[in-house]
């Protein structure tokens, strides 16, 4: 009798962990995309400044 609730609890915990991991993976992917976009913006902002500095030399 004791076994079934504990096994049910274990299954519940495993499912919850799976859910958390999948959400975490989605979050990481979204974060990577955001970082890439930010890097592109920074690069596009730096490019004119770098050319400006070189033209001043």
Curated annotation (Swiss-Prot):
Quote the InterPro entries the UniProt record gives: IBV_3A
- Enumerate the Pfam families for this protein: IBV_3A
Sorted alphabetically, the keyword list is: Host-virus interaction, Inhibition of host innate immune response by virus, Interferon antiviral system evasion, Signal, Viral immunoevasion
- The residues forming the signal peptide are 1-22
* GO terms classed as biological process: symbiont-mediated suppression of host innate immune response
Domain of life where this protein originates: Viruses
This chain's function reads: Involved in resistance to IFN.
Report the protein name in the record: Non-structural protein 3a
Originating species: Avian infectious bronchitis virus (strain M41)
